[in-house]
Amino acid sequence: DYDQILVVDADTIVHPDCPNFFDETNGKYAGVMNDGDYEWVNKSISQYGSKFFNRDTFPVWRYVNGGFQIFNKTHKDYLKGLLDWYNKNSNELNQVFGKWNSTDQTCINLYREEQNLDMTILPVCYNLQDLSRKNLLYFHPQHWWSDELHFLKNGWVYHFNAIPPNPMNRDANYWIER
């Protein structure tokens, strides 16, 4: 039996001393705002929104990164509806996945907005993402900062996404293992 469940991406690590984020959901769906490439997010919303949701925008500050989402028992019907929506649109979705920005993340956000699901936005410490652009990953011996795990001082849940090719070949797997 459960009260709430966390859905987390495979490229994400939760620090063992992380506070209990379930205590911060207020009994609602909860996630962390996407804190990365806003051009990518806006383009993705426009692409998927226009084709599947009869809208090409919504407030980017409500766009949740799919790598950290908390649901509870009250969301069973909502999730069933999301799955039904996906199954109904899967052929068209599979044609655009890989061609457009994003995959399921944007569709989940657009569907959530369409359904007007009440949510709690959690602080970025629970899905610290886009670490490269925040200068929290060491990629080059000439960087002015030291080769340490700087991200440990900046959050509790580390999402190793959007890591560009780099001279030291340090990809998500490198950082997860380290």
Summary of predicted features, one role per range:
Residues 1-43:
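GT-A fold catalytic core of metal-dependent nucleotide-sugar glycosyltransferases
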Residues 3, 67, 156:
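Residue-level detector of short, conserved catalytic/binding motifs and their immediate flanks
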Residues 8, 64-65:
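Short, basic and Ser/Thr-rich N-terminal targeting/leader segments
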Residues 16-19, 42-45, 79-84, 170:
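A short secondary-structure junction signal
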Residues 28-29, 66-69:
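Small-molecule pocket liners
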Residues 36, 68, 76-78:
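An acidic intrinsically disordered interaction segment
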Residues 47-60:
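Short, flexible, basic/aromatic active-site loop/helix in glycosyltransferases
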Residues 59-60, 64, 73-178:
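A glycosyltransferase accessory/donor-loop signature
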